């Protein structure tokens, strides 16, 4: 049977067909849909973990126990999971272990453009790299076999375009492999220094065998065409090159990106007149090719920054035929990202504007949009968890300079569970004056409303224990009187809490609790706001909320009732009572 699938759907299907039994992940674009689709296969136990490190440890434990296991994350998630990744390379596995890393060239939804191919090189584990959905399915199945044959985790690298593009896939049936017998082996699985020292040379021997495999792997293939131009490439870059050049070039398509196939590269390079290496972001393949003493054209012609596309490739390989593939003459209005109408974060950021002398350290989530006009409410955004820990650093630096500058650390509920708890402990332990604002919108909203430990539901929909953020704050040492919960739709309550937090001289926590506006609050389903033109002075104060439902049109203020979610924050901002509630 055939089906049209995204790369993420095909990865999930491949895991199912391979007999995978356990899967764990933390949501992050462009990888999120992998686990969501895996969860549709009831034969596989699937879970959202609190962060990528935990997810890989869960999957790693399952693999050592004898089950085939999969772990998925976006590229920056592998930074979080690097600790177990490197050690699992030493221990090896029992059942197959595949770690999917979804890189994001072009930074569609990320804070950096790191190239995770270097993780395979650094951790010394094999890496596969598909170029379309069919290969996503086939390569995942192969990855599990490779993992078990070589007793090693396999890194599976995809990129945004592979994850989200659709292509035709041939489906197969599930292979039931069961759970292998687990045998206790402390010298293999307990990495104290003495045992780890013994495992390192074993890993090096595996690498020698993997290098031989790469030279003979069907995943690395030569496609002969015109030998005047030779192209070494991998992943989505192969699709771009093939689209532009067709049979007017020859290709060495790399499907096993580590170890790279040295013999195959030498043979291919000798057979072509001019050699190009086409890859997104870092010159990973190019550096290896040049280390073999082979001359090639790579990043001196292709950009390091951003995605590649057929137009960019054509400008280099065939400039005389260059066409503006993606250019359009139509001028469309810009649509910058904004917090949704009725977003519960808006009230907090609006209220924070009062404290112009304060520093606000932000974090990763929908609330990252608080950086942008008209809210302009955030000073830094580094990585998950840094909303609190970077705030501690600011506060300590200001103290060293004898500056009494207030610092607010802002993060969401899922981010708090991910990596904010340890940061809050650090704030308490080191007696920081930081005030923390946790925006609890009852979901992991930015990646598509996944469950988290605060929702009381698991990925499969089972009822679980609700982890109370206020109780965590109290448990790690924040004083009871320094923990407040507010409804961010209530501006007066929110402003009073922020005033206390601003004046606090010890760790202070505000939990702003209100469900994401897109979760369709039943109580406000019929509530809308409208502008009373007779009362409105056109002061445009309401526009400072940055709500996409509010606009100044044809010389007057207007609220788009089809977009309004009835949060009523604009009503509270208007000093003239010109915004009124409609419905019930």
Predicted regions and their residues:
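Flexible, low-complexity linker and terminal segments
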Residues: 1-8, 18, 130-339, 344-347, ...
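Thiamine diphosphate
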Residues: 1-133, 161, 224-225, 248, 371-511, 521-522, ...
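Short acidic, glycine/serine/threonine-rich loops at helix termini
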Residues: 34-37, 60, 81-85, 107-114, ...
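Short helix-loop-beta junction
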Residues: 37-43, 242-252, 471-479
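A glycine-rich helix N-cap at a beta->alpha junction
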Residues: 43-50, 91-102, 179, 184-187, ...
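Conserved thiamine diphosphate
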Residues: 104-153, 159, 186, 194, ...
């Amino acid at each position: 049977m055939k089906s049209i699938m995204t790369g993420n759907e095909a990865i999930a299907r491949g895991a199912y067909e391979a007999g995978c039994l356990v899967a764990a992940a933390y949501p992050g674009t462009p990888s999120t849909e992998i686990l969501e689709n895996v969860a549709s296969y009831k034969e596989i136990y699937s879970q959202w973990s609190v962060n990528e490190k935990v997810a890989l440890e869960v999957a790693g434990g399952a693999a050592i126990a004898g089950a085939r296991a999969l772990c998925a994350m976006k590229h920056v998630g592998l930074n979080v999971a690097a600790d177990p990744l490197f050690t699992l390379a030493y221990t090896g596995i029992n059942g197959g272990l595949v770690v999917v890393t979804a890189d994001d060239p072009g930074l569609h939804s990320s804070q950096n453009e790191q190239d995770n191919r270097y993780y395979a090189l650094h951790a010394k584990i094999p890496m596969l790299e598909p170029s379309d959905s069919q290969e996503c399915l086939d390569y995942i199945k192969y990855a599990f076999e490779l993992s078990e044959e070589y007793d090693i985790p396999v890194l599976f690298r995809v990129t945004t375009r592979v994850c989200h593009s659709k292509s035709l896939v041939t489906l197969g049936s599930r292979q039931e492999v069961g759970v292998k017998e687990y045998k206790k082996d402390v010298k293999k699985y307990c990495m104290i220094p003495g045992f780890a020292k013994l495992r390192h040379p074993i890993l090096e021997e595996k690498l020698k065998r993997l290098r031989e495999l790469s030279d003979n792997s069907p995943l690395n293939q030569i496609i002969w065409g015109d030998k005047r131009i030779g192209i070494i490439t991998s992943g989505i870059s192969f699709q771009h090159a093939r689209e532009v050049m067709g049979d007017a070039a020859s290709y060495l398509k790399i499907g096993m990106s580590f170890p790279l196939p040295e013999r195959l590269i030498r043979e291919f390079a000798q057979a072509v007149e001019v050699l190009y290496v086409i890859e997104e972001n870092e010159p990973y393949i190019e550096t290896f090719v040049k280390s073999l003493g082979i001359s090639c054209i790579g990043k001196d012609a292709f950009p390091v920054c951003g995605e590649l596309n057929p137009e960019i490739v054509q400008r280099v390989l065939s400039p005389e035929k260059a066409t503006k593939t993606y250019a359009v003459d139509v001028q469309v209005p810009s649509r910058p990202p904004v917090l949704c109408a009725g977003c519960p974060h808006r009230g907090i950021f609006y209220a924070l504007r009062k404290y112009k002398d304060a520093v606000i350290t932000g974090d990763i989530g929908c609330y990252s949009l608080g950086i942008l006009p008209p809210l302009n409410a955030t000073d830094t955004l580094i990585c998950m968890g840094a909303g609190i820990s970077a705030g501690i650093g600011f506060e300590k630096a200001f103290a060293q300079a004898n500056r009494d500058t207030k610092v607010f650390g802002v993060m969401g509920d899922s981010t708090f569970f991910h990596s904010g708890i340890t940061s809050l402990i650090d704030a308490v332990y080191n007696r920081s004056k930081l005030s923390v604002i946790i925006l609890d919108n009852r979901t992991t909203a930015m990646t598509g409303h996944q469950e988290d430990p605060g929702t009381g539901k698991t990925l499969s929909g089972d009822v679980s224990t609700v982890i109370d953020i206020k109780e965590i704050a109290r448990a790690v040492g924040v004083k009871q009187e320094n923990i407040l919960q507010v409804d961010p739709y209530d501006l007066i309550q929110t402003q009073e809490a922020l005033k206390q937090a601003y004046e606090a001289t010890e760790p202070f926590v505000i939990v702003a609790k209100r469900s994401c506006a897109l979760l369709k609050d039943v109580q406000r389903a019929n509530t809308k706001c409208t502008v009373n033109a007779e009362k409105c002075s056109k002061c445009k104060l309401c526009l400072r909320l940055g709500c996409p439902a509010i606009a100044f049109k044809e010389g007057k203020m207007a609220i788009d009732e089809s977009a309004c979610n009835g949060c009523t924050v604009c009503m509270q901002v208007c000093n003239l009572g010109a915004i009124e509630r409609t419905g019930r």
